[in-house]
Amino acid sequence: MDIDPYKEFGATVQLLSFLPHDFFPSVRDLLDTASALFRDALESPEHCSPHHTALRQAILCWGELMTLATWVGANLQDPASRELVVTYVNINMGLKFRQLLWFHISCLTFGRETVIEYLVSFGVWIRTPQAYRPPNAPILSTLPETTVVRRRGRSPRRRTPSPRRRRSQSPRRRRSQSRESQC
């Protein structure tokens, strides 16, 4: 079966493959980040989002893989074979987990649309011949925000008065503005 773990999130394995292998932090760093940012949501019995569910599954699978690696390390007698298994897990499976964890943590942090826009931008940048592309790759945190997190209820935006607007307003107008900002 050819299963793409990013399909339902609007991305693909191929889209993530444009990022170099050393782009992704270590699994340990990603697990620490997920724990620091999303521990309550990940441990909650409530469903939060598909990204939380995917993160939970990836974390559980990584734990099982580490249990297997520990067992192999303790039970495989041949040091050369043991080293081959450890290297395979770290290089191949480790990269897949690093990509998966990075994707879902980034989607929860920046928003799915921003992450996909970043992946597309980076893919275009990396495939553009060096002579025709800007010297610096796109950076996820500098992309324009597409999602805005707001508290429940609406609070009006503070606006700077335009130069054409008179500075003095009637007291009645001021009171209504202050009443709105308290909501």
Curated annotation (Swiss-Prot):
Its main location: virion. HAMAP family: HBV_HBEAG (MF_04076). Pfam families: Hepatitis_core. Homodimerizes, then multimerizes. Interacts with cytosol exposed regions of viral L glycoprotein present in the reticulum-to-Golgi compartment. Interacts with human FLNB. Phosphorylated form interacts with host importin alpha; this interaction depends on the exposure of the NLS, which itself depends upon genome maturation and/or phosphorylation of the capsid protein. Interacts with host NUP153. Belongs to the orthohepadnavirus core antigen family. It is found in: Virion; Host cytoplasm. A motif (Bipartite nuclear localization signal) lies at residues 158-175. Signal peptide: none annotated. It comes from the Viruses. Disulfide bonds: none annotated. This is Capsid protein. Residues 143-183 are annotated as: Disordered. Self assembles to form an icosahedral capsid. Most capsids appear to be large particles with an icosahedral symmetry of T=4 and consist of 240 copies of capsid protein, though a fraction forms smaller T=3 particles consisting of 180 capsid proteins. Entering capsids are transported along microtubules to the nucleus. Phosphorylation of the capsid is thought to induce exposure of nuclear localization signal in the C-terminal portion of the capsid protein that allows binding to the nuclear pore complex via the importin (karyopherin-) alpha and beta. Residues 177-183 are annotated as: RNA binding. Gene3D superfamilies: Viral capsid, core domain supefamily, Hepatitis B virus. One of its GO terms (molecular function) is DNA binding. Sequence repeats lie at residues 155-161, 162-169, 170-177. The modification Phosphoserine is found at residues 155, 162, 170.
